[in-house]
A protein has these predicted regions:
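Short Gly/Pro-enriched turn/cap motifs at secondary-structure boundaries
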Residues: 20, 57-64, 109-113, 119
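Glycine-rich beta-strand-centered segment in the early N-terminal region that forms part
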Residues: 22-35, 50-93, 132-134
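Short glycine-/small-residue-rich Rossmann-like dinucleotide-binding loops
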Residues: 36, 74, 89, 230-234, ...
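Residue-level marker of beta-strand positions
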Residues: 65-67, 82-83, 120, 172, ...
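NAD(P)H dinucleotide-binding glycine-rich loop of Rossmann-like/cofactor-binding domains
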Residues: 88-166
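Mid-domain Rossmann-like dinucleotide-binding core that forms the NAD(H)/NADP(H) cofactor-binding site
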Residues: 133-216
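Glycine-rich cofactor phosphate-binding loops and adjacent beta1-alpha1 units
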Residues: 158-164, 186-187, 202-273
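C-terminal substrate-binding/catalytic core of Rossmann-like NAD(P)-dependent dehydrogenases/reductases
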Residues: 259-293
């Protein structure tokens, strides 16, 4: 069976490739119906990644966020026509300690293998999760992005102490919005404060208990824990600002992606006894938990 794959050949140039798809008795075939463009896809397209990385990974189909309909399932897991969310993480082994999205052997669509920008996507059944009936398909296309925040919050609940009266979220973009919204849902008794740079964006956080411009934070502000959702060149400033305002023995969850190292105030990390952890991507259990939320 021929599959049409739309690959990025070089920055700003796509090409159509026709690849043979082997049909077997253990893999499901899904036709993508809604896709979401991630900032990582934009960096590949714009050539904003290192030249060595581009040479190594291109040509490659982009997109790792999306949903689709099952068109073939020899395993009987799904009925034909079932709407599913596609999981981009492709583990090749299981580990009792390390989650599937942190195994160095795992592949990831639109990073170490072709993404979802193709006519058909083929994988074993557990790489697809059935969508709830009636869900808005456009909203469902963002499931992967939301699952990353869900994954980070669940790790935070494991790592942090139980005093969670005030949680700060640095970042007024999509990731900050999604993370703070989930925090409000999963920790309804906690106050969620948002720290950003754009007043128009901060005004969208109507569910938050408070919003602050990072240049106008009250001197007496104190938080128990924090999530960094800034990334890029401003990540260092955001993390250091968190360190300034967080209570001793607080936990800092880092979610923002930076291409360059971000220097932080390690002296105060030690003095306050802070715990800092990073989270990346997500696994099947995160999708299942999110869709049940």
């Amino acid at each position: 069976m021929l599959n049409t794959v739309y690959q990025l050949k070089r920055p700003r140039q796509f090409e159509v490739a026709f690849k043979e798809m082997e049909i077997d008795d253990r893999q499901v075939i899904v036709r993508p119906t809604r896709l979401s463009i991630c900032h990582a896809d934009q960096r590949y397209y714009q050539g904003a990644r290192a030249e060595e990385i581009l040479r190594q990974k291109l040509p490659m189909a982009l997109i790792h966020e999306g949903i689709g309909k099952v068109i073939y399932d020899p395993t009987g897991t799904f009925e034909i026509g079932t709407e599913v969310v596609m999981i981009p993480n492709r583990p090749v082994e299981k580990d009792d300690i390390i989650a599937e999205n942190y195994l160095r052997s795992s592949k990831f669509c639109a990073s170490s293998m072709d993404g979802f920008l193709q006519e058909y996507v083929q994988a074993v059944p557990d790489r697809f999760v059935r969508l709830p009936q009636g869900i808005n398909p456009t909203v469902a296309a963002y499931t992967e992005l939301v699952s990353v925040s869900f994954h980070a919050i669940n790790r935070f609940l494991r790592f942090s102490h139980e005093r969670r009266d005030v949680i700060g979220v640095w970042g007024d973009g999509n990731l900050g919005y999604i993370t703070s919204l989930l925090l409000k849902k999963m920790l309804p008794d906690s106050k969620i404060y948002i720290f950003g740079v754009t007043e128009n964006k901060l005004s969208d956080f109507t569910f938050a208990d408070g919003t602050y411009c990072v240049n106008e934070i009250p001197a007496d502000m104190q938080i128990d824990h924090a999530f960094e959702c800034v990334g890029g060149g401003a990540a260092s400033k955001a993390i250091n600002q968190i360190i300034d305002y967080i209570h001793p023995e607080g936990t800092i969850s880092i979610l923002g992606v930076s291409e360059d190292p971000a220097p932080i105030n390690t002296r105060m990390v030690l003095e306050k006894g802070l715990r800092i952890f990073g989270s990346s991507r997500s696994g099947r259990s995160d999708y299942e938990g999110l869709l049940q939320l």
